């Protein structure tokens, strides 16, 4: 039985990835930062084929633990970087775990025989740290795809900057190591929407959907989104997981980084759809998904279907 290691495999996106690999007959090893916190991963135990699931404690800043985690894996998915918007200390909360964690991970996989494929869950921020606003030099209606120049700004949110630098680190590693025995590919989802598999309320993605659904602004950043009726390119969490699974099992994608996106809607229309009401405007296509459709044979769900089905679990 082939084994996949999924760093961040119990999170919002990671849970769906774990399900995809279990459903397809893989042994799955999922990381947990604190294995005593069973509430973080207990929802995975109800999945089909959960007898092939293993949970292993891991801190990505611990090189020894990382080397041990990847040591018996055929495929490794790295989605274990923090997604925090209300950040107090960007260096310790975002930059260190994201960038140092990526550097440590690259060192671990380079020194581990037997790995066949590595997939990084990057972010639209790996392409444009201004998201959901346009990249520098582009208008609100200009499209963006993998042929466009990557854009970053020191004024962007620390989360976006950290993801951009981490992706640059991966690209440099690929360039500096032309004779790797395994392939490395990345996916860069836009705003990820959908239902959480767990009953936890600590996911930033589901939390943002809850805020938009109820038009709550806990800080100036969120309030500005409402005030400017900002538009978001959106993708369903199930589609992100499917794209990651397909990327992991498909040969010949070394060095590719796929934008994962469906349609773009204004935040006011997102609010309507999250409340099962029809949007006022038709969707736009800003972040293009042609490459993922071509290479991965992906079809992306309409955003309306995804937002209409959103459920936020409250105790």
Task: Specify the residue positions occupied by each region the protein language model found.
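Glycine/proline-rich active-site loop of Rossmann-fold NAD(P)-dependent oxidoreductases
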Residues: 179-182, 194-210, 246-257
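Substrate-positioning beta->alpha
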Residues: 203-208, 221-246
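NAD(P)H-binding glycine-rich loop region in Rossmannoid oxidoreductase-like domains
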Residues: 35-100
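Active-site Tyr-X1-5-Lys
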Residues: 152-184
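Conserved Rossmann-fold NAD(P)-dependent oxidoreductase catalytic core, especially the SDR/UDP-sugar
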Residues: 88, 93-154
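N-terminal Rossmann NAD(P)H-binding glycine-rich loop of SDR-like oxidoreductase domains
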Residues: 4-26
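Amphipathic terminal alpha-helices
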Residues: 290-293, 301-315
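Mid/C-terminal beta-alpha module of Rossmann-like enzyme folds, strongest
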Residues: 229-231, 241-289, 310-311
């Amino acid at each position: 039985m082939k084994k996949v290691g999924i760093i961040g495999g119990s999170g919002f996106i990671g849970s769906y990835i774990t399900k995809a690999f279990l459903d397809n007959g893989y042994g799955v090893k999922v990381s947990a930062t604190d294995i005593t916190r069973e509430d973080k991963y207990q929802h995975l135990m109800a999945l089909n084929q959960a007898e092939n699931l293993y949970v292993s404690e891991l801190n990505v800043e611990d090189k020894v633990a990382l080397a041990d985690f990847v040591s018996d894996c055929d495929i490794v998915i790295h989605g274990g970087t923090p997604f925090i918007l209300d950040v107090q200390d960007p260096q310790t909360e975002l930059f260190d775990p994201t960038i140092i964690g990526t550097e440590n991970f690259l060192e671990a996989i380079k020194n581990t025989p037997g790995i066949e494929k590595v997939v990084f869950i990057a972010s639209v921020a790996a392409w444009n740290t201004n998201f959901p606003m346009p990249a520098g030099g582009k208008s609100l209606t200009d499209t963006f795809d993998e042929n466009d120049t990557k854009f970053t700004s020191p004024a962007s949110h620390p989360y976006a900057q950290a993801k951009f630098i981490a992706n640059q680190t991966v690209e440099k590693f690929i360039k500096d190591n032309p004779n790797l025995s395994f392939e490395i590919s990345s996916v860069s989802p836009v705003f990820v929407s959908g239902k959480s598999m767990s009953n936890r309320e600590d996911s930033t993605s589901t939390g943002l959907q809850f805020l938009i659904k109820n038009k709550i602004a806990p800080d100036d950043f969120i309030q500005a989104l409402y005030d400017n009726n900002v538009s978001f390119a959106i993708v369903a969490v199930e589609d992100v997981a499917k794209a990651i699974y397909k990327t992991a099992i498909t040969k010949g994608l070394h060095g590719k980084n796929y934008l994962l996106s469906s349609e773009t809607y204004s935040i006011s229309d997102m609010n309507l759809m999250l409340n099962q009401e029809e949007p006022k405007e038709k969707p736009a296509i800003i972040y293009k998904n042609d490459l993922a459709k071509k290479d991965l044979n992906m079809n992306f769900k309409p955003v309306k279907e995804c937002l209409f089905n959103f459920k936020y679990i409250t105790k």
